């Protein structure tokens, strides 16, 4: 495979035209067999992997023969073994086939994605988790509307094969892919009769399909947005020298192209900004309402004609930031005006100017958080704390540590919001639920538990936010951090609250359109 990568870098045409012979190499299936055992050994005991999951090169040769014959049942090729472990071995060899197929298809995709990213330097940022927070701080407040789009999961297998055909010229190499996709499509478990491409499936083959599918959508969509979004804006220009001011304004574009590092320069001001978190792209638009309608119409037509998908209107929602809030990352996102008083002294005169800037104001969704806590049996639907009965069998330290971890995750997750007053209501619910859980365990009351454990009960478990800042900042920075917003790049992995709350929001929107 390393040799194939090296040859592919030297001659991309050879790499695209001769993928099919790789399916006839026994080493490919040995590699996929080893990779499958490495993945499955973490979920199954080793004694189950010793005798039944051995690679048989005789079976591999039968598989290669069926590939040569272009048999459309290559996934179910182990059907001649009469022993009771046939179903399990069939699954084992099916996973090996999927691993081998993924290894072959990953080679052109990795090279193509590398060159496509090198050709579009602007598109590097929106594929990283670190692009979300600069987007929220810099692009979001200066936008008028937000398009909240959703990447469709269900897609016909032939559409996926055709998208691969655009980049892989070796048509026979796509026959195994077509066979696998149709085998999955026609399986009894698949009731929708389509390929469900989701990033949460813990299979290398489906993760590869998801990555390719998203990159294909973004490459086409980003190229279209790039053509129509960039424009020169005088509002972002800098004029240190005031001589011949009006003449410089007239020739701003000419000077900025030739001497961009001199006193007169202009910046690109894209009116359309794109970022993606998981499977939810967000498009921020700065312009008139007609531009928003055109972008929304383009997204619907793009899905309909390119992927042959009929998208419901609620799949692409538009929000005006001046009237509504947008929901993303578990926040309610809105824009507020921030007045700044500027005093300028020139000679003996003092000038005072009021500048109004727009900044993002993320709001902690208290009501949805209480609803999720009620689902997890920490409180009732009205927010009244109750005991966590399923934790009464644990030790006192384990109970305190679990409540402590929940609160630290919530406080850490919503540290990007200035207004954290609502979080203290969540803190009260968790602290009282912790006390009721301990009282239920010891068959006593909250007063007795607090008297026995002392006043350090709640201080031990719910005073970690001060330590959180003191460990990461100095004394001056810790005091300043209480007045500043702090984004943490690991918040999507800390708390599944954002995904679960977003699912609730999606169901509400779908039910609204179904009525």
Curated annotation (Swiss-Prot):
The keyword ATP-binding does not apply. It holds the Pfam family Intron_maturas2. One of its GO terms (biological process) is mRNA processing. One of its GO terms (molecular function) is RNA binding. Disulfide bonds: none annotated. Keywords: Chloroplast, mRNA processing, Plastid, RNA-binding, tRNA processing. It is found in: Plastid, Chloroplast. One of its GO terms (cellular component) is chloroplast. The keyword Kinase does not apply. InterPro entries: Domain_X, Maturase_MatK, Maturase_MatK_N. Belongs to the intron maturase 2 family. MatK subfamily. Usually encoded in the trnK tRNA gene intron. Probably assists in splicing its own and other chloroplast group II introns. This is Maturase K. It comes from Pinus attenuata (Knobcone pine). The lineage of its organism: Eukaryota, Viridiplantae, Streptophyta, Embryophyta, Tracheophyta.
């Amino acid at each position: 495979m390393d040799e194939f990568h090296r040859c592919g870098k030297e001659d991309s045409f050879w790499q695209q035209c001769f993928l099919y012979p790789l399916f006839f190499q026994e080493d490919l299936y040995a590699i996929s067999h080893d990779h499958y055992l490495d993945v499955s050994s973490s979920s199954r005991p080793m004694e189950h992997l010793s005798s039944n999951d051995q690679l048989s090169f005789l079976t591999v040769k039968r598989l290669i023969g069926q590939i040569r014959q272009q048999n459309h049942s290559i996934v179910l090729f182990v059907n001649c073994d009469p022993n009771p472990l046939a179903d399990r071995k069939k699954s084992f060899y099916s996973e090996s086939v999927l691993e081998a197929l993924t290894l072959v298809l990953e080679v052109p995709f990795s090279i193509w994605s590398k060159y496509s990213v090198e050709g579009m330097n602007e598109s590097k940022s929106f594929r990283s988790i670190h692009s979300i927070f600069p987007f929220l701080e810099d692009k979001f407040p200066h936008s008028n509307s937000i398009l909240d789009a959703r990447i469709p999961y269900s897609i016909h297998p032939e559409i996926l094969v055709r998208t691969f055909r655009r980049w892989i010229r070796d048509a026979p190499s796509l026959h195994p892919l077509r066979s696998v996709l149709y085998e999955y499509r026609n399986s009894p478990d698949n009731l929708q009769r389509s390929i469900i491409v989701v990033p949460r499936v813990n299979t290398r083959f489906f993760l590869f399909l998801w990555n390719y599918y998203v990159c294909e959508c973004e490459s086409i969509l980003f190229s279209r947005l790039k053509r129509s979004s960039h424009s020169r804006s005088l509002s972002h220009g800098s004029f240190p020298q005031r001589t011949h001011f009006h003449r410089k304004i007239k020739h701003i574009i000419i000077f900025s192209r030739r001497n961009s590092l001199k006193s007169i320069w202009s910046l690109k001001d894209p009116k359309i900004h794109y970022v993606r978190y998981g499977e939810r792209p967000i498009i921020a638009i700065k312009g008139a309402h007609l531009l928003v309608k055109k972008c929304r119409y383009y997204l619907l037509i793009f899905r309909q004609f390119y992927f042959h998908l009929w998208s419901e209107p609620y799949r692409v929602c538009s929000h005006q930031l001046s009237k509504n809030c947008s929901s993303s990352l578990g926040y309610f996102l809105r824009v507020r005006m921030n007045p700044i008083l500027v005093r300028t002294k020139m000679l003996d005169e003092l000038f005072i100017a009021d500048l109004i800037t727009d900044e993002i104001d993320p709001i902690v969704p208290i009501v949805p958080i209480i609803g999720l806590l009620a689902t997890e049996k920490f409180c009732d639907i009205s927010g009244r704390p109750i005991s966590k009965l399923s934790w009464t069998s644990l030790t006192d330290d384990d109970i305190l540590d679990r409540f402590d971890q929940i609160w630290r995750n919530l406080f850490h997750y919503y540290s990007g919001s200035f207004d954290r007053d609502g979080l203290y209501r969540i803190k009260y619910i968790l602290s009282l639920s912790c006390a009721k859980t301990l009282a239920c365990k010891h068959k006593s009351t909250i007063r007795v538990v607090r008297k026995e454990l002392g006043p350090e009960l709640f201080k031990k478990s719910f005073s970690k936010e001060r330590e959180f800042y003191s460990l990461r900042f100095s004394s001056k920075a810790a005091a300043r951090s209480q007045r500043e917003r702090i984004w943490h790049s690991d918040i999507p992995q800390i708390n599944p609250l954002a995904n679960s709350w977003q699912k609730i929001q999606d169901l509400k929107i779908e039910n609204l359109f179904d009525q």
